[in-house]
């Protein structure tokens, strides 16, 4: 038995006169004076079907009992709607199907929420009934675009000579960075597998094994606290190459990225993408993932305010802190309440306050202007290029606090002043991150990325003497202020790798225990190698203009790492625990 001969949402006036068989779910049912109209939905959209007793009394009688989300199959002829019934807002709005036969395939209970877009339903309810939520057009469209984007990655990477190779899901735990998800081994009592946080080590092994261009659509797992753009399991397009320098590799990735956006969205991206080194990104935008859809850059005002009597600035300069400013062009429209809200906001990032000055036709005005000489004020106006109607914001603190506070305030002000063009796609590379950062909690240095990242060649000489000044040969791909991918050149010299481990406090025994097979492999002619990984969930979220990656994942977890539909994680039987040589402590 054939249920359907066409998809509902793609029928047009070109199909008028054709006999068609359709199947799907009842979206809406309307009874207009004895003629019953039903919007029949499938994954492509919906079409209006008409039950007229003059065409089929039996089908009309059956349609009396139809309710929302009943599953039916119908046969009928496509005809043009009368002019007054045309709906230009939908693709099928010029046609309707006159039903000759109907088969009821299944009934449905009343859904707990409307299965339409623009619904005001809590996310918890949607996730509990995800099998219903998936029927909504926006959800399907997001997942279909994800499929298209993933397919485009496969096509363009394959066209560039990359080979799809699977790497193990069960591996040993190498506790660096986030916590591992652990899987107990039944056959090896007391031993555990770890689910991969990334295929990093295995893809380097593939390069040593002679696979010079690898990719994989890889499932990765991290046991970390969640937020809007994080999940315990996530998907990345994992990529590695050998015998390519950074410029060559980034050029390939730019072309792959541009081709994907062109194929899926029809948008031409200019290449090459702009590049900013990490230090310039922080100095200009206060962020290592800057949103460049608008200006509003940070301004160094230290020389302009030097010699002023404002204690906050004087103390900052005396303690060798930094002072930076944002010039909110047209900020005169911001109220005192807005300024107070901004002051509270920067406090989240450690700022002890937010100084401000309005620019009027009389010059600078605020309760702190009296502490600045006319010369100071003149220099502030010059260096900030401030004009009447602008509003200046200042933070004076350590570099970390100042950049974090103003970098985030920059985004908040841009939203408030409507400076962001939501239709823009601004890609850029942020390169040469610090190789190490200081962990104040652990009181030691740690790897900014991972312990296999190579330093830039010119900084190898200071690797042991000034490690915190060493730049890494790394690159992050940023889209509209969000990191969507990142990677770098890898260490392929076992001697350099040993120095890195030593600096990180990983002794020879510990290194061998965690990474022994990679360290052994590096001794057998490892080639120069580099790579990166794109976060598919985040890529799709941004291109689809969604606020959360949960909107672009078929079965997402909540911020507590739970699946509300299936009820995982869950308890297991005592017998299962015994087989795994485990017991639960109360």
Swiss-Prot record:
**Main location group:** cytoplasm
Family matches, as Pfam families: GAD, tRNA-synt_2, tRNA_anti-codon
Catalyzed reactions per annotation: tRNA(Asx) + L-aspartate + ATP = L-aspartyl-tRNA(Asx) + AMP + diphosphate
What Gene3D superfamilies is this protein classified in? Answer: Bira Bifunctional Protein, Domain 2, GAD-like domain, Nucleic acid-binding proteins
The first-level EC class reads ligase
Per the UniProt entry, the Enzyme Commission number(s) are 6.1.1.23
**GO cellular component annotations, sorted alphabetically?**
cytoplasm
Record carries keyword tRNA-binding:
no
Q: Where are the transmembrane segments?
A: none
Segments for region (Aspartate) = 200-203
The protein's superkingdom reads Bacteria
Family under the similarity heading: Belongs to the class-II aminoacyl-tRNA synthetase family. Type 1 subfamily.
Q: Which HAMAP family match?
A: Asp_tRNA_synth_type1 (MF_00044)
Q: What does this protein do?
A: Aspartyl-tRNA synthetase with relaxed tRNA specificity since it is able to aspartylate not only its cognate tRNA(Asp) but also tRNA(Asn). Reaction proceeds in two steps: L-aspartate is first activated by ATP to form Asp-AMP and then transferred to the acceptor end of tRNA(Asp/Asn).
Q: What is this protein called?
A: Aspartate--tRNA(Asp/Asn) ligase
Please name the source species: Brachyspira hyodysenteriae (strain ATCC 49526 / WA1)
């Amino acid at each position: 038995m054939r249920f359907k001969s066409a998809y509902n949402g793609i029928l047009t006036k070109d199909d008028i006169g054709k006999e068609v068989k359709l199947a799907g779910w009842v979206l809406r049912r309307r009874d207009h004076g004895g003629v019953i109209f039903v919007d029949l939905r499938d994954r492509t959209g919906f079409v209006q079907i008409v039950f007229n007793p003059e065409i089929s009394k039996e089908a009309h009688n059956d349609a009396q009992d139809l309710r929302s989300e009943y599953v039916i199959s119908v046969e009928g002829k496509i005809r043009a709607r009368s002019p007054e019934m045309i709906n230009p807002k939908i693709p099928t709005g010029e046609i309707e199907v006159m039903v000759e036969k109907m088969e009821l395939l299944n009934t449905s209970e009343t859904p707990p929420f409307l299965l339409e877009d623009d619904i005001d339903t809590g996310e918890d309810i949607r996730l509990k009934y995800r099998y219903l939520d998936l029927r909504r057009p926006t959800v399907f469209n997001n997942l279909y675009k994800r499929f298209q984007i993933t397919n485009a990655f496969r096509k363009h990477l394959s066209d560039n000579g990359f080979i799809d190779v699977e790497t193990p899901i069960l591996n040993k735990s190498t506790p660096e960075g986030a916590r591992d998800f652990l899987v107990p081994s039944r056959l090896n009592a007391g031993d555990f597998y770890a689910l991969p946080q990334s295929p990093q080590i295995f893809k380097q092994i593939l390069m040593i094994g002679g696979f010079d261009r690898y990719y994989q659509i890889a499932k990765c797992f991290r046991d970390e606290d969640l937020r809007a753009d994080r999940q315990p399991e996530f998907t990345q397009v994992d990529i590695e190459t050998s015998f390519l320098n950074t410029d060559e590799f980034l050029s390939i990735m730019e072309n792959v990225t541009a081709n994907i956006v062109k194929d899926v969205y029809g948008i031409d991206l200019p290449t090459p993408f702009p590049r900013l080194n990490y230090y310039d990104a922080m100095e200009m935008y206060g962020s290592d993932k800057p949103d460049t859809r608008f200006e509003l850059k940070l301004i160094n005002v230290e020389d302009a305010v030097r010699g002023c009597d404002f204690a906050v600035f004087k103390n900052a300069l005396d303690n060798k802190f930094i002072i930076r400013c944002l010039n909110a062009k047209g900020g005169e429209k911001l109220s005192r309440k807005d300024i107070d809200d901004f002051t509270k906001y920067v406090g989240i990032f450690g700022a002890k306050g937010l100084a401000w000055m309005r620019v009027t036709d009389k010059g600078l005005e605020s309760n702190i202007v009296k502490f600045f000489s006319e010369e100071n004020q003149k220099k502030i106006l010059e260096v900030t290029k401030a004009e009447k109607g602008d509003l200046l914001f200042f933070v004076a603190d350590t570099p970390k606090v100042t950049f974090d506070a103003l970098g985030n305030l920059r985004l908040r002000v841009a939203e408030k002043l409507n400076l962001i063009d939501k239709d823009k796609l601004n890609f850029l590379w942020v390169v040469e991150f610090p190789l190490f950062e200081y962990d104040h909690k652990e009181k030691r240095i740690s790897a900014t990325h991972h312990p296999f990242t190579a330093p830039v060649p010119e900084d190898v000489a200071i690797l042991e003497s000034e490690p915190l000044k060493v730049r890494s040969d790394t690159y992050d791909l940023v889209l509209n202020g969000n990191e969507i991918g990142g990677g770098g050149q890898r260490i392929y010299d076992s001697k350099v790798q040993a120095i890195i481990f030593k600096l990180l406090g990983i002794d020879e025994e510990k290194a061998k225990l965690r990474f022994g097979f990679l360290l052994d492999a590096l001794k057998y002619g490892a080639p120069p190698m580099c790579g990166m990984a794109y976060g598919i969930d985040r890529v799709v979220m941004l291109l689809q203009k969604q606020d959360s990656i949960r909107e672009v994942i078929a079965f997402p977890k909540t911020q507590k790492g739970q699946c509300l539909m299936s009820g995982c994680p869950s308890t297991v039987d005592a017998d299962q625990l015994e087989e795994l040589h485990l017991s639960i402590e109360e």
